[in-house]
């Protein structure tokens, strides 16, 4: 057992075991960061249309969304350690197939990559919930999500260099490295063999849990907020570079760098500030949604505000950094233990669905209007989510006192 484990077998979020967790998360998501750059370039060079490229890239998130609840079901049946071993093997095989296959196979391989990601994120977050003290849970989830974001700052630069070099050997080396290293680090990672659920969770039980979303105000409101927010995040990630190139008023590279740095700094510096007692903080969530709204509205006004648009990166980065770990930590406390991971899987699916819709639905809006109109609609989505949070304030905060007394 890790030397930093306490008498109850719980670990410290900065212990050696959890540093391995975070490194594993970085390596796993580095593969997607690389493929997100290289696959569209390869596909376009091979003659695929923009619609075909969009379908191929969207297959990743869509498969993720569909399989998260199933991943949670298998966690309860087989335990995080066994599921982790299976998914790392699947991940490695998928990357090797990317190396060997041509563009016609990319759609199915992206879907297969989405399968591995659905299981990976559920398994990692189950491990954090099971292995950390309640008071450290928010810090652990924040650090985990931080390390899933870092590859998006570093790996794309490497991927572009590989593409521009036109040497297939470097792509092969990258894929082999990103297939082998997670296996070496993660195959024996310190994951629990069983979860609190610790039971075989049948499909009937899983569909019964789906109905619970309408009966559980915390799950319903959290999922709705995440759906709206991730739609905004997805639209920004998909269309911001095209928007800035088309207007010529700002640099997408500078904007994304500022946003990425804000995300990393917030998730590290503020990791201990995220509520880790199961309490709902209405004004924190509303404030994050306000930041998201300000960020997209400044983008909508890009042609009028010029360089001031980089403030949008700060607002958007702040919302992006704290929204997901805050809501995930809250739900990990309030959901029933016997179906916690299936219900959390449904919540995470709302993120995947929103992100996908941000590219698909907002793309249709751009085609029929303008980028400015699309970002204004994103602002309205954030405002609607903020109104939901305020309207349901009393119901969401009704259990705060009881959970705080239990925590103390």
Language-model region placement:
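Symmetry-related core transmembrane helices of the 12-TM Major Facilitator Superfamily/SLC fold
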Residues: 171-186, 375-391
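Juxtamembrane intracellular "pre-TM" segments in multi-pass secondary transporters
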Residues: 2-15, 190-222
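Cytoplasmic helix-loop-helix junction between adjacent transmembrane helices
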Residues: 111-147
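Paired small-residue
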Residues: 104-113, 307-315
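Structural signature of the two symmetry-related core transmembrane helices
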Residues: 82-96, 283-297
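Helix-loop boundary and gating motifs at the non-cytosolic
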Residues: 12-56, 218-225, 230-243, 255
């Amino acid at each position: 057992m890790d030397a930093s484990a306490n008498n109850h077998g719980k670990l410290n979020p900065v212990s050696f075991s959890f540093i391995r967790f975070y490194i594993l998360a970085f390596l796993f998501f580095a593969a997607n960061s690389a493929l997100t750059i290289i696959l569209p370039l390869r596909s376009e060079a091979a003659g695929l249309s923009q619609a075909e490229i969009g379908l191929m890239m969207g297959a990743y998130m869509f498969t993720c969304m569909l399989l998260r609840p199933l991943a949670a079901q298998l966690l309860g049946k087989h335990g995080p350690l066994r599921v982790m071993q299976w998914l790392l093997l699947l991940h490695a095989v998928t990357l090797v197939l990317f190396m060997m296959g041509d563009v016609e196979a990319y759609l199915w391989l992206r879907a297969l990559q989405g399968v591995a990601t659905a299981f990976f994120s559920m398994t990692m977050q189950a491990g954090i919930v099971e292995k950390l003290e309640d008071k450290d849970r928010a810090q652990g989830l924040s650090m985990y999500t931080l390390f899933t974001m870092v590859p998006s700052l570093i790996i794309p630069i490497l991927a572009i260099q590989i593409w521009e070099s036109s040497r297939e050997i470097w792509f092969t080396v990258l894929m082999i490295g990103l297939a082998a290293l997670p296996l070496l680090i993660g195959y024996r990672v310190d994951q629990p063999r069983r979860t609190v659920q610790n039971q075989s969770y049948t499909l009937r039980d899983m569909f019964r849990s789906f109905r619970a979303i309408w009966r559980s105000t915390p799950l319903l409101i959290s999922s709705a907020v995440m759906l709206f927010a991730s739609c905004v995040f997805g639209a920004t990630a998909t269309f911001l570079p095209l928007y800035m190139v088309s207007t010529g008023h700002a640099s997408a590279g500078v904007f994304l760098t500022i946003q990425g740095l804000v995300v990393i700094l917030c998730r590290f510096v503020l990791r201990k500030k995220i509520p880790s007692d199961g309490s709902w903080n209405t004004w924190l969530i509303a404030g994050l949604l306000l930041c998201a709204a300000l960020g997209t509205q400044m983008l909508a006004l890009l042609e009028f505000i010029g360089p001031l648009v980089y403030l949008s990166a700060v607002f958007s980065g702040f919302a992006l950094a704290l929204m997901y770990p805050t809501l995930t930590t809250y739900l990990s406390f309030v959901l029933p233990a016997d179906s916690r991971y299936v219900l959390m899987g449904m919540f995470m699916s709302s993120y995947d669905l929103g992100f996908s819709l941000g590219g698909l639905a907002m793309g249709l809006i751009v085609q029929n209007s303008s980028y400015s109109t699309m970002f204004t609609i994103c602002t309205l989505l954030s405002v609607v989510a903020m109104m939901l949070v305020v309207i349901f304030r009393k119901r969401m905060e009704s259990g705060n006192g009881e959970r705080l007394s239990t925590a103390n």
